Amino acid sequence: MLRSLVAIRASRLGLSSHAEPWSQMSLKELKVECKNRGLKVSGKKIELVRRLKNLNITNSNDSHLRIDIDRPKPPRNKSKKQVKPINSNVKLDRNIVLNSRINDTITKENDTTPTINESNVKTSPIEHVQNPPVEHMQEPPVDHFGKSSPIKESKDIITTTRPYANGFSTDQDNYQTNSLALRDKIFLLTSTTCITIWWWWPHMPSFIDQILKSYKYLQSFL
């Protein structure tokens, strides 16, 4: 009870302290103050004091509201902001693990040997066999009975077939004579026919007479 009474008394003293400077002014001064603050000028002294007092109360409330608005607000949900980098690190770790697994599978697939009909195929490098030239080959020893080794016989065969490899064999000549061009054949035919006509032209009338006589003779039998 005592605390409530003290609070009421303090509020009344505050109101009286706010009202005391306005109450000490004259009516003309109050009208000037109301005019400067945009309030009504008409009325009694008590009404003017109330208007000025209410204006001070509203101004004080507005100032409190502005102070509250201008104050920086504390950040909310601090725990969530702290959790975000942890989640991002976890995602990065997962991506690294997935990439490493994919790389392992790719290397394993590349290491495996190709299969044909479910059988492994082993690739081996191609070996080029180089035979030594014939001139540098050593001749084997000849037997006392006059028989040479098969290596010498093969050498003789190679030496005999060398000229034919350069295009001097009879088979190649025959192939060249048989494979005449069409224009060459036409030229040969025309030349032979012209020569025969030129040779047999003086004897042509007698030859024609003989042909006609033989034809008449055959008709006589028919």
UniProtKB/Swiss-Prot annotation:
A Pfam short name: SAP
Composition bias, Basic residues: 74-83
Topology in membrane: Single-pass membrane protein
UniProt GO cellular component terms: mitochondrial membrane
SMART domains: SAP
Transit peptide range per the UniProt entry: 1-12
Residue ranges, compositional bias (Basic and acidic residues): 136-150
UniProt KW Transmembrane keyword: yes
SAP domain ranges (all copies): 22-56
Keywords (A to Z) from UniProt: Membrane, Mitochondrion, Transit peptide, Transmembrane, Transmembrane helix
Compartments, as annotated in UniProt: Mitochondrion membrane
Transmembrane regions: 186-202
Domain of life, source organism: Eukaryota
Region annotated Disordered, chain positions: 65-85, 131-150
Family, per entry: Belongs to the AIM34 family.
Protein name: Altered inheritance of mitochondria protein 34, mitochondrial
Organism annotation: Zygosaccharomyces rouxii (strain ATCC 2623 / CBS 732 / NBRC 1130 / NCYC 568 / NRRL Y-229)
